[in-house]
C-alpha cells in the first residue's frame, strides 16, 4: 500500500474507556478508530462529513465492521491509528484502520469498516455522486491482491 494514502494520528487511551485490567475495553476500540477516521477526513482531505451531511442531507453509516484484537492497548498509552480507503464502490467505502503502539512496531488491532452512503430524507443507501468519486478516488489504496479480512490479518501477522 502506498504510504501517502495511509493517514495517521495519535491518541491516548483514557481511564473511562478501560476495563478493570487497565486494557482498552473491546467495545471502545471502534470509537477510537472512528474518531481518528473523522480527524483524518477533516485534516488530510479537508472534508467534513458533518458539513456534507448538513448541506446535502447525505452521509455514511457503518454497514459492517470486522475487527481483530491482537495486543491490549493500555491505560494512558499513546497509540498510533492509521486509516486508508481500500475500496471505493458505488454505494459504499471499505476503510482499513489499524491501531499500533507509539513506535508502530506492535499491531494492536485491525478494523475493516464498510461505510454505506446514506440519504437522510429517503432512509436508504445512495449512490456516490460523480463529484464524490472524483474527489475520493485519488485516495483509494487497494491491496495488491483482493483478500478476505482473515487473509489480510494473517498477512500482517506474518510481516511483523
Language-model-detected regions and their locations in the chain:
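Functionalized membrane-embedded alpha-helices
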Residues: 79-83
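Short, charged beta-turn/beta-strand-edge "cap" motif at the junction between a beta-strand
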Residues: 85-88
Amino acid at each position: 500500500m502506498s504510504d501517502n494514502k495511509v493517514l495517521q494520528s495519535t491518541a491516548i487511551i483514557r481511564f473511562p474507556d478501560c476495563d478493570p485490567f487497565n486494557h482498552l475495553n473491546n467495545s471502545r476500540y471502534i470509537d477510537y478508530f472512528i474518531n481518528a477516521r473523522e480527524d483524518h477526513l477533516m485534516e488530510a482531505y479537508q472534508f467534513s462529513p458533518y458539513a456534507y451531511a448538513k448541506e446535502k442531507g447525505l452521509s455514511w453509516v457503518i454497514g459492517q465492521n470486522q475487527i481483530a484484537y491482537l495486543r491490549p492497548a493500555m491505560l494512558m498509552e499513546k497509540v498510533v491509528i492509521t486509516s486508508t480507503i481500500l475500496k471505493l464502490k458505488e454505494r459504499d467505502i471499505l476503510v482499513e484502520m489499524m491501531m499500533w503502539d507509539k513506535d508502530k512496531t506492535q499491531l494492536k488491532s485491525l478494523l475493516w469498516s464498510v461505510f454505506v452512503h446514506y440519504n437522510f430524507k429517503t432512509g436508504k443507501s445512495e449512490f456516490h455522486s460523480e463529484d464524490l468519486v472524483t474527489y475520493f478516488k485519488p485516495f483509494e489504496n487497494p491491496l495488491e491482491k483482493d483478500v478476505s479480512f482473515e487473509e489480510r490479518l494473517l498477512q500482517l501477522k506474518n510481516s511483523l
